[in-house]
């Protein structure tokens, strides 16, 4: 406020408004993307855990190498086992991954089971 005026000048009002507008147009979308990436990372972590459990079950007992669909934390995961030469690929896909599945490979053996 200049020269003991009782209100704000137009320049002060416009600069404050433009500052708030700048903050809203830059920080809010970045915050939104950060939250979406956090949900994606959590979903991927759950997917890795399920793949690890399935691989561990296969290695220990020789069972569990079947493709299946699992629902966990309101997300649907599709786990698929594939043979590729002497390897078994375990791939998992979910809607949260934006159609990008990820896979882990293990050596396929008929004799290496704990039981």
Curated annotation (Swiss-Prot):
The modification N-methylphenylalanine is found at residue 8. It comes from the Bacteria. Processing of ComGE in competent cells requires ComC. It is a single-pass membrane protein. Its main location: membrane. The chain crosses the membrane at residues 13-31. This is ComG operon protein 5. PROSITE patterns: PROKAR_NTER_METHYL (PS00409). Required for transformation and DNA binding. The keyword Protease does not apply. GO terms for cellular component: cell surface; plasma membrane. GO terms for biological process: establishment of competence for transformation. Residues 1-7 form a propeptide. Keywords: Cell membrane, Competence, Membrane, Methylation, Transmembrane, Transmembrane helix, Transport. The keyword Acetylation does not apply. It is found in: Cell membrane; Cell surface.
């Amino acid at each position: 406020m200049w020269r003991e005026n009782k209100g704000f000048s137009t320049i002060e009002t416009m600069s404050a408004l433009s500052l708030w507008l700048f903050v809203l147009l830059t920080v809010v979308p970045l915050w939104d993307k950060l939250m979406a990436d956090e949900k994606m990372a959590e979903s991927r972590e759950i997917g890795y855990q399920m793949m690890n459990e399935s691989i561990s079950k296969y290695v220990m007992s020789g069972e569990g190498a079947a493709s299946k669909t699992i629902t966990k934390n309101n997300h649907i995961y599709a786990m698929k086992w594939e043979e590729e030469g002497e390897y078994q690929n375990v791939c998992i896909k979910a809607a949260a991954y934006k159609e990008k599945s990820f896979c882990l490979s293990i050596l396929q053996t008929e004799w290496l089971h704990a039981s």
